[in-house]
A protein has these predicted regions:
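Bateman/CBS regulatory modules and CBS-like beta-alpha motifs in cytosolic regions of diverse proteins
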Residues: 1-26, 32, 37-40, 44-45, ...
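Short, basic and Ser/Thr-rich N-terminal targeting/leader segments
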Residues: 30-31, 118
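N-terminal short leaders/motifs
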Residues: 46-52, 56, 78-79
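Short hydrophobic beta-strand motif reused across regulatory alpha/beta modules
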Residues: 46-49, 133-139
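A short, polar/charged loop-to-alpha-helix boundary motif
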Residues: 54-70, 140-150
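Gly/Ser-rich helix-loop-strand patches that form or flank binding pockets
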Residues: 117, 121, 136-147
Length: 150
C-alpha cells in the first residue's frame, strides 16, 4: 500500500509569521498535534508541533523534576514571560530540518522514516511540492485494518 492511498490531502497549514498563541489555537481547534509551516507561495518551511510549543512555554520543564521548590519560586516570573512568548513568531521555534516522504512511497517506508527520525507526521511530497500529510496514526490504523481486520 502506498502513502498516496491514505494521506490527508486537505492539510491544515500555519503561516510562518503566526504567533505561538495563534499556532496553539489552530492545533487545538482542529484537534491535531502538529502542522506544516508555510512561507511565501505556500512553500513548506518547517513543522510546528505540540512538543515545540510546550518547550517554548516551559523551556525549563526539566527543573520541575529536579527541583520543585526552585521551579515554584520562578513561577511568577514565568507567568509574565508567557504573556510575552504568546506573541513570538513560530518561525523561531519550528522544526526546520524537514523530513518528508514521497507520495509513491510504501506505508512501511513512511513508518520506518517516522520511527528512525522520532517524528509522528511527514509532509508528503510530489515533485518537490507538498501534496498532503501522513501521520503515524494513519499508518497504524491502516495496518491494523489490513493485518488484523480491525
Amino acid at each position: 500500500m502506498k502513502v498516496k492511498e491514505i494521506m490527508t490531502k486537505k492539510v491544515i497549514k500555519i503561516k510562518k509569521d503566526a504567533t505561538l498563541e495563534e499556532a496553539a489555537e489552530i492545533l487545538a481547534k482542529n484537534e491535531i498535534s502538529g502542522a506544516p509551516v508555510v512561507g511565501k507561495k505556500n512553500k513548506l518551511v518547517g513543522i510546528i508541533s505540540e512538543k515545540d510549543l510546550f518547550r517554548a512555554f516551559y523551556p525549563d520543564f526539566r527543573d520541575i523534576i529536579t527541583d520543585l521548590r526552585l521551579w515554584l519560586s520562578r513561577e511568577k516570573r514565568r507567568k509574565r514571560k508567557k504573556e510575552k512568548k504568546k506573541k513570538i513568531s513560530i518561525s523561531k521555534i519550528m522544526t526546520r530540518n524537514l523530513i518528508t516522504v514521497d507520495i509513491d512511497a510504501s506505508l512501511i517506508k513512511a513508518g520506518s522514516i517516522m520511527l528512525v527520525n522520532k517524528v509522528s507526521r511527514l509532509p508528503v511530497i510530489r515533485n518537490g511540492k507538498m501534496v498532503g500529510i501522513i501521520t503515524r496514526r494513519d499508518i497504524f490504523r491502516r495496518l491494523l485494518e489490513e493485518e488484523m481486520g480491525i
